[in-house]
């Protein structure tokens, strides 16, 4: 939600759309999820946690069912965040939300099978950082990286669930 340039440059307008979507879905009794984009300090004009504090209203902080964090190490010079600190802080801000990693992946053009496997293992075996931490670990290029015969142009929507993720990780 807070990645600069994805949804436009007007944070207030982006927040208004987020709030409207939350209210509509929440009113219907459906599950709600919010994915925030993490970057190291100084990469974006406003850091993820500051954006969430400033633009997410309290009723949404208390009511969103899932809060996921999207992060790509390759896009951030290999920076490894302190996930314990991040998820502990998010748990205090979103006390009723289930927390997890919403997107991750080895995106570098130079990524090897070994680097993908190591990164996937690191994310898929992350400990439970906070009381409501549920994991997540949506590997963005799962089909391309883990489904036999799927090339680099394969759609993430194809063959969804075709293979067990743990088995595919072992075979990567």
Show which residues each predicted segment covers:
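Aromatic- and acid-rich polysaccharide-binding/catalytic face
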Residues: 36-38, 48-83, 87, 97-107
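Active-site neighborhood of glycoside hydrolase catalytic domains
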Residues: 10-36, 44, 52-64, 89-97
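Short, solvent-exposed loop/turn segments at secondary-structure junctions
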Residues: 4, 41-42, 108-110
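Well-ordered, non-membrane alpha-helical segments in soluble/globular domains
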Residues: 11-20, 45-54, 79-89, 113-126, ...
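Substrate-binding cleft of secreted/luminal carbohydrate-active enzymes
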Residues: 98-172
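Helix N-terminus capping/helix-initiation residues
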Residues: 47, 57-58, 135, 165
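Active-site groove signature of glycoside hydrolases
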Residues: 1-11, 33-38, 137-141
């Amino acid at each position: 939600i807070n990645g600069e340039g994805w949804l436009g440059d007007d944070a207030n307008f982006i927040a208004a759309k987020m709030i409207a979507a939350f209210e509509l879905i929440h009113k219907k009794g459906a599950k709600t999820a919010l994915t925030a984009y993490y970057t190291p300090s100084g990469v974006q004009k406003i850091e993820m946690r500051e954006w969430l504090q400033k633009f997410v209203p309290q009723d949404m902080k208390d009511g969103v069912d899932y809060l996921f964090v999207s992060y790509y190490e390759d896009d951030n010079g290999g920076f490894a965040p302190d996930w314990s600190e991040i998820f502990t802080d998010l748990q205090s801000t979103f006390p009723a939300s289930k927390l997890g990693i919403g997107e991750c992946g080895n995106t570098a053009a130079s990524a090897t099978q070994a680097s993908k496997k190591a990164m996937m293992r690191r994310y898929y075996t992350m400990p439970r950082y906070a009381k409501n931490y549920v994991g997540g670990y949506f590997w963005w290029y799962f089909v391309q990286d883990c489904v036999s015969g799927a090339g680099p142009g394969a759609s993430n929507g194809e063959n969804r669930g075709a293979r067990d993720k743990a088995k595919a990780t072992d075979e990567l």
